[in-house]
UniProtKB/Swiss-Prot annotation:
Keywords annotated in UniProt: Hydrolase, Lipid A biosynthesis, Lipid biosynthesis, Lipid metabolism, Metal-binding, Zinc
Catalytic activity: a UDP-3-O-[(3R)-3-hydroxyacyl]-N-acetyl-alpha-D-glucosamine + H2O = a UDP-3-O-[(3R)-3-hydroxyacyl]-alpha-D-glucosamine + acetate
Entry GO terms, CC: membrane
Pathway note: Glycolipid biosynthesis; lipid IV(A) biosynthesis; lipid IV(A) from (3R)-3-hydroxytetradecanoyl-[acyl-carrier-protein] and UDP-N-acetyl-alpha-D-glucosamine: step 2/6
Matches recorded under InterPro entries: Ribosomal_Su5_D2-typ_SF (IPR020568), UDP-acyl_GlcNac_deAcase (IPR004463), UDP-acyl_GlcNac_deAcase_C (IPR011334), UDP-acyl_N-AcGlcN_deAcase_N (IPR015870)
Name of one Pfam family that matches: LpxC
Organism: Chlamydia trachomatis serovar D (strain ATCC VR-885 / DSM 19411 / UW-3/Cx)
Any one GO BP annotation for this protein: lipid A biosynthetic process
Cofactors that this protein relies on: Zn(2+)
Protein known as: UDP-3-O-acyl-N-acetylglucosamine deacetylase
Binding site for Zn(2+): 79, 237, 241
Length: 286
């Protein structure tokens, strides 16, 4: 396995905003953390109870990813986690005053800006970067995910919305790095179909959703604050979600991930299979 210095933030940073699903205003604080802390969530800085950002703590995947531990819950974590993972931040304490991370403008831009504002500090201890040795695979109905051995972390995603001609079929393949995330992925906003709005509201979701933090796709056009940031913004946002969900594996790893029509639930399923494979390979080395 490869190794590099562990990394944390240089200073504490804060952001206040509204959660997209519950619609509550929340204060988000990111603080530096000691080596081997990992990425952990809590609602209060005075609390000793933290939720580690790990697959074992996933409790919900309905339109976002939710973590819980011992009765404490934090939802819509994927955009923030994708930013931390892509920037190589291993150790950070995250405090959120409500049960949902603020959505910002629906992209990862606000979290990227927070990390830039905080700065990144290398630490003395190292973190091992695992390399997947054998392919792993997950399929459910038309959703397909696979991860193959690679010397880099790469995602190739195919999005197919046969029922919405405005989105249609989109494909994007990228090696994920701080630079590619910053330029190609972080600006891409969450999206929904206009035809889904009533269903989502009946489910108690998108209570804080608006054109300022989401893009709506109709059969004959787009409802958005400004133009699309990329012609294929939806598939790029799907890559953003996938990075955040796979970061819950809990360690940096190298693989070529291929996804067709995946969402949070299937992302987590693949993440569990990757984790099982990495743990098995580590046992073989021992």
């Amino acid at each position: 396995m490869l190794g590099r210095a562990q990394r944390t933030l240089k200073r504490k940073v804060c952001y206040s905003g509204v959660g997209v699903h519950f619609g509550k205003a929340a204060m988000l604080t990111l603080e530096p953390a000691e080596e081997n802390t990992g990425v952990v969530f809590s609602h209060h800085a005075a609390s000793e109870q933290y939720i580690p950002a790990r697959l074992a703590n996933v409790c919900g995947t309905g339109r976002s990813t939710t973590l819980s531990l011992d009765g404490s819950v934090i939802s819509t974590v994927e955009h923030l986690l994708a930013s931390l993972y892509s920037f190589g931040v291993d150790n950070v304490r995250i405090y959120c005053s409500e049960d949902e991370i603020p959505i910002g403008d629906g992209s990862a831009q606000v979290f990227m800006d927070l990390i830039d504002q905080a700065g990144i500090q290398e630490q003395e201890q190292t973190v091992q970067i695992a390399r997947l040795a054998h392919p792993v695979y997950y399929q459910y109905q038309d959703t397909i995910l696979a991860a193959f051995p690679s010397d880099e972390f790469k995602i190739s995603y195919t999005l197919h919305y046969s029922h919405n001609s405005t989105i249609g079929t989109q494909y994007r393949s990228l090696v994920i790095s701080e630079e590619s995330f910053r330029k190609e992925i972080a600006p891409c906003r969450t999206f929904a179909l206009y035809s889904e709005l009533c269903f989502l509201m009946e489910k108690g979701l998108i209570g804080g959703g608006c054109v300022g933090n989401a893009v709506l796709f109709k059969d004959d056009g787009v409802i958005s604050l400004g133009k699309l940031r990329f012609p294929d913004e939806p598939v790029r946002h799907k890559i953003l979600d996938l990075i955040g969900d796979l970061s819950l594996v809990g360690t940096p790893f190298l693989a070529h991930v291929i996804a067709v029509g995946s969402g949070h639930s299937s992302n987590i399923a693949l993440g569990n299979r990757i984790l099982e494979a990495l743990q098995h390979e580590q046992e073989l080395v021992k």
